[in-house]
């Protein structure tokens, strides 16, 4: 569970009594002031991604079979040289695990990252303008469409996802 104000991702186990208990391997700590907000899990490789709301970063962690989790990388969600406010919002992967998207409210951008299928490493690929203050978005089950709403918008935007590249193209806004 991502705990924004504590800069920690809490881990739990579920007992036979249906009660949660702290995980014996402990919690995951993020950078001070990062503000972990949302988590996503890769469908195949055991990687866990954390969107940090307050510093606009994206962390990748790897979960080993024994339950140990190690930090692998931390990337900026915004374009190189971006100097404005940071306010990360949401994170989703395509169902095939090849692409990861984040939304950032202050810049009104969706960011695209490629996921290396061998190592799991993230590569920043592109940034796309979208609805003002994009608080939430979803990717359809086929992985061909991304639907986004803006906190400061009356519209919903539908972006098509190019299967080979993950690039977004605006299909409609209503």
Q: Would you name each region that the model predicts?
A:
Residues 1-13, 21, 25:
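Aromatic- and glycine-enriched pocket-lining scaffold segments that form the walls
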Residues 21-28, 69-77, 122-130, 168-174:
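Beta-propeller fold detector
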Residues 51-61, 69-103:
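Oxyanion-binding "anion nests"
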Residues 30-47, 77-97, 130-145, 174:
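Beta-rich, blade/repeat-based domains predominating
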Residues 12-20, 61-69, 113-120, 159-167:
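Short loop/turn segments immediately following beta-strands, especially the blade-tip
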Residues 7-9, 56-58, 108-110, 155-156:
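Structural signal for beta-propeller blades
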Residues 1-4, 42, 50-54, 102-105, ...:
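Conserved beta-strand positions in repeat-built beta-propeller and related beta-rich domains
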Residues 111-160:
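C-terminal hydrophobic structural anchor segments
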